[in-house]
Amino acid sequence: MAYTPEPFAASGDAVAVGQVVEIPYVWTDGVVYLHLENIGTAYTLTVNDSKVAEVEDPSTPAEFALTPYIREGKNAIALTLRRSAADRINAVPASRKAFENCYLYTQTKRSIRDFEIALVPDSTRKFGVLELAIVAQNGFNYDEPVTVGYDIYSPQGKLLEFNMQEVTIPGRSTDTVRFTPFIYGTNANKWEPGAKNPPLYKVMLFTRRDGAYREYMPLKIGFGKTELVDGRLTRFDKELKLVKAGYNAAADRKTTLAELKALKAKGNNTICPDYPQPGWFYDLCDELGLYVIDCANINAPEKRDDRKVGGTPSNDPSLVDEYLERVKAMYYRSRNHSCVIAFALGGESGNGYNMYKAYEWLKSVSYTHLRAH
């Protein structure tokens, strides 16, 4: 369901936009989310006059669980557009159509809330291992069994592996189901930059109930792992040379595809954006065989060499939560894309307490990606 808010009030530097959304009864028996991107400024989200969230980052897409705030019938979903309290660290976002790709969606109360996936070489380098973790959720108030599973097809279309598992989840909570099957023949389908058509495996995540499939989630992943060995960047045990180009997605997918192809034709194999990009940007890089060093929306060159507490935004403890929030948002959005080989904590920014805490967090959650600043 599209979310296309219109202005309805203004006060000082703030503008209120909103839309009255008709929520059908069937949605009230599920879990409802609002996806927001291309807002262009900081905002406060309210639903039926209840505050849901305050967001200072104008560039990174975000999702919000609205189930506690909505009801059957008409619902007023509003955004108060305002100046960011963290303007000092914002990169300048690309100009895109306001509120493009904002929408609401629903899932059943027994569904897939999140996942992590990678197809990497095993310890012998002879085969691949699918490292898959599915976070299943139970939106009911009581224990419920939830069955989740997957299948994986080779780039040539052959079914390679299929499995599912049932787990009983307490009410209003989640549980993680892990699968680690060997995938044979992967060395014939290496995902590497420079290839004309880099091979991608097709994976389908699903939930099942009473013998019927209830939810499908199609994915594409490439085989490989980028590692730092003795100070050398390697992939498939060969030293990797990155030819980098700074680039942010254009206003639309078609233009971005043409520009990425042009960058690749010039010999570039690594794209370095200034802040998190639209979801389809990473899809294009997966398909084209371009590495991406993703970047959090942190750009704080102000007094970057000042080592005093508060001397630079990166060493101002009052901003530590905002730094962490932005690094987390970057990581969770793009971590499952084969093209993403590293995460940058930000653009031109000084060092300090906030950067250190962000680095610590990123290191604690990801061992398959490199970290940069």
Language-model regions, residue ranges each:
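Secreted/periplasmic carbohydrate-active enzymes, especially glycoside hydrolases
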Residues: 1-279, 283-287, 341-342, 361
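Short hydrophobic/aromatic-enriched beta-strand-loop microsegments
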Residues: 55, 290-296
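Aromatic- and acidic-residue-enriched carbohydrate-binding clefts of CAZyme catalytic domains
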Residues: 245, 295-323, 327
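Generic structural signal for well-ordered alpha-helices
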Residues: 260, 282, 327-331, 355-359
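Conserved small/polar residues in nucleotide/adenosyl-binding loops
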Residues: 368-373
